[in-house]
Amino acid sequence: MLDSKGVSIDEYITLAKEHNAEIIQYRNKNADKEFIKEQLIYIRNIYDGFLIVNDAYELVEYCDGVHLGQEDLRAIDEDVHKAVMLVRSLVGEDKILGISTHNKEEVLDANRLDLNYIGLGAYRSTDTKKDITGILGDSIEDIAAESKHLVGAIGGVRLDDEFTHVTYNVIGSGLLK
């Protein structure tokens, strides 16, 4: 994501610090595991907050937790519950585990899972995801209220967006309170 915007990791970390991001997520769908590992080690050396890796749960020893999308979970096991149980057993209870959710049904399903948070959205369409179906808009509040987990609003969220039932605004993979 940063590459497509011409933003270096150093610039991104500087912005995350300026905006007091408590958690950042490293997401690179195109890189191999060794490259991701090197990037996680580098980020860990320059950022003191929580670092989450997207998808690459095998690399959790280099960060504080893992985030998985619905498709990524189903690639592990068609049964999302089994997939989360497997990933939780691999990453351990001391690591953060979160998943993406897109509607009330997925949020209610996530309530039965051993998670630390959910990402909920998309709130708006974004530059990278223009053709999203199911934009939540203002309904994000009602759906977020159904979650027993901390909620991060994802997809098209801006710094000035305010929500009652959302803990974090996820902006460019940085979670801001």
Q: Where are the regions that the model predicts?
A:
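Glycine-rich phosphate-binding active-site loops on the catalytic face of alpha/beta enzymes
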Residues: 1, 68-84, 117-133, 156-177
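Active-site mouth loops of central-metabolism enzymes
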Residues: 1-10, 95-101, 158, 176
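N-terminal active-site wall of soluble small-molecule enzyme domains
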Residues: 10, 17, 21-90
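Catalytic cores of alpha/beta
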Residues: 12, 51-68, 102-116, 145-176
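Conserved short-loop catalytic and cofactor-binding motifs
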Residues: 27-31, 98, 128
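Alpha-helix-loop-beta-strand connector modules within alpha/beta enzyme cores
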Residues: 37-55, 79-102, 131-159
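Internal catalytic-core helix/loop-beta-alpha segment
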Residues: 90-119, 124
